[in-house]
Regions:
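Short amphipathic helix-loop junctions that connect adjacent transmembrane helices
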Residues: 28-47, 170
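C-terminal ends and interior cores of transmembrane alpha-helices
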Residues: 83-104
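Hydrophobic core of transmembrane alpha-helices in multi-pass small-molecule transporters
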Residues: 104-126, 130
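Helix-to-loop junctions at the C-terminal end of transmembrane segments
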Residues: 59-80
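A membrane-interface helix-boundary motif in multi-pass transporters
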Residues: 75-80, 167-193
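A late C-terminal transmembrane helix in Major Facilitator Superfamily
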Residues: 140-172
Length: 207
């Protein structure tokens, strides 16, 4: 309760929950979405998931290299990666939704998913770095409590994300006759969540 009362810690907790919820909600629906909308086989969608993970790895390395190269501005660099990663993730998800409505081979789904992976990887690792940096700020002897609070927020959001993502698609599918539109609605919701999460980090920078 005392840690939650700290403005920075409380706001960062909400950021962690919101961003990781959006991050994990796409996990279980991306491959079925590509299979249904673009007519890809299971093998092709699995390969696409591998491409996304490759993008994530690239994003992680890019973020790590930039913080090493600009050690004197680590906090600023981390916040840039967090905000940029969230915004780019939102854009990629919105483009996925748009591509699903277009369908066919006209949409560069490979590039879209790869860039989404880069955005996800960079923001996720930067968020962990920001978490460790912010843990030492505020009242002393609460570092562990802050990390525990943020870790709990991350764990809960990860547990809920995959479940809520699939449920949301099913519910949207009952309302919308077009499966691509149902998936698109969920992707747009995730994009909005990423944008909101980014605004929370912006507010932290203003303090």
């Amino acid at each position: 309760k005392e840690v939650w009362g700290e403005v920075q810690a409380g706001r960062f907790t909400i950021f962690v929950f919101a961003s990781m919820l959006a991050y994990s909600a796409q996990d279980l629906i991306l491959e079925p979405f590509v299979g249904l909308t673009f007519g890809w086989t299971v093998g092709e969608t699995t390969a696409l998931a591998g491409m996304q993970h490759g993008g994530m790895l690239l994003g992680m390395f890019a973020m790590a290299f930039s913080t090493y190269a600009f050690k004197s501005k680590t906090r600023h660099i981390l916040h840039l990666w967090i905000k940029g990663g969230c915004v780019l993730s939102a854009i990629c998800l919105a483009l996925l939704a748009t591509g699903g409505l277009i369908g066919g081979n006209a949409w560069p789904i490979n590039i879209n998913v790869f860039v989404l992976g880069v955005a996800n990887g960079s923001f996720a690792v930067a968020a962990i770095g920001g978490m460790m940096m912010l843990a030492s700020e505020g009242r002393s002897q609460r570092d562990g409590l802050r990390m525990g609070l943020w870790g709990a927020a991350q764990a809960i959001s990860f547990a809920l994300g995959g479940f809520l993502g699939t449920v949301a698609v099913d519910v949207a599918g009952l309302w919308l006759e077009n499966p691509a539109a149902a998936y698109g609605l969920v992707f747009f919701a995730e994009a909005a969540l990423f944008v909101w999460a980014s605004s929370l980090i912006f507010n932290l920078d203003q303090q």
